[in-house]
């Protein structure tokens, strides 16, 4: 995805306010061997781009003053109650160095799982994203979590996710192996099932 930005000359709270009034959002690009670079972006274009999942988890081509560089979106600051982006941070990407970043999880096939079809269980998505490490060229936009075999009372963990070639869980996630999805039978369904099994009193 391509992002167009402009070099920002003015600094300070007053300058940021003037830029916002002009429909601009402030930002910064950092990382790599180059010095941090202050930028400004068109607010409306940025606002719509931020609605796309891929904008948060893909390598972006950021063009500033005619020069293109590969970056990752690292932070977004929103106004507390207005539909307003106050500031964005981008980190430069080195094609030869592994990066650590979070990618979204897409859950598939819960409706055909034994948990749902046989036990009327509810499958809960405990995590919506997970932190991985890989070279920029191997970065996936998202990871798929196949729920087709989950049974009632079972959980799927981080290590159960099929990872593409060149992608690994970061060390602490690999060690902790957290739950990403679980299948539970609602309390009401358990009570109903127990009631159906009771023998009526004589």
From Swiss-Prot:
UniProt xrefs under InterPro entries: Rbsml_bL25/Gln-tRNA_synth_N, Ribosomal_bL25/Gln-tRNA_synth, Ribosomal_bL25_b-dom, Ribosomal_bL25_C, Ribosomal_bL25_long, Ribosomal_bL25_short, Ribosomal_L25_dom, Ribosomal_uL5_bac-type
Gene Ontology molecular function terms on file: 5S rRNA binding; structural constituent of ribosome
Gene3D superfamilies, alphabetized: Ribosomal protein L25, beta domain, Ribosomal Protein L25, Chain P
HAMAP family: Ribosomal_bL25 (MF_01336), Ribosomal_bL25_CTC (MF_01334)
Gene Ontology cellular component list: cytosolic large ribosomal subunit
Known role: This is one of the proteins that binds to the 5S RNA in the ribosome where it forms part of the central protuberance.
Family according to the record: Belongs to the bacterial ribosomal protein bL25 family. CTC subfamily.
Protein's organism: Burkholderia ambifaria (strain MC40-6)
Complex formation: Part of the 50S ribosomal subunit; part of the 5S rRNA/L5/L18/L25 subcomplex. Contacts the 5S rRNA. Binds to the 5S rRNA independently of L5 and L18.
Protein name: Large ribosomal subunit protein bL25
Keywords of this entry: Ribonucleoprotein, Ribosomal protein, RNA-binding, rRNA-binding
GO BP: translation
């Amino acid at each position: 995805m391509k992002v167009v930005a402009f070099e920002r000359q003015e600094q300070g709270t007053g300058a940021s306010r003037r830029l916002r009034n002009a429909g601009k959002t402030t930002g910064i690009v950092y990382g790599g061997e180059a010095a941090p670079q202050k930028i400004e972006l068109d607010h409306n274009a940025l606002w719509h781009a931020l609605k796309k999942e891929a904008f948060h988890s893909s390598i972006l081509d950021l063009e500033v003053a005619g020069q293109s560089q590969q970056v990752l979106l690292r932070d977004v600051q929103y106004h507390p109650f207005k539909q307003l982006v106050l500031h964005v941070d981008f980190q430069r990407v080195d094609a030869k160095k592994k990066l650590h970043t979070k990618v979204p999880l897409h859950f598939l096939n819960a409706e055909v799982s034994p948990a749902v079809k046989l036990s009327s269980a509810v499958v809960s998505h405990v995590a919506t994203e997970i932190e991985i490490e890989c070279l920029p060229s191997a970065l996936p936009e998202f990871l798929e979590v196949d729920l087709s075999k989950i049974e009632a009372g079972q959980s799927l963990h981080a290590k159960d996710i099929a990872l593409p070639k060149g992608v690994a869980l970061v060390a602490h996630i690999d060690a902790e192996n957290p739950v990403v999805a679980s299948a539970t039978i609602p309390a009401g369904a358990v009570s109903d099932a127990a009631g159906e099994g009771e023998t009526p009193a004589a």
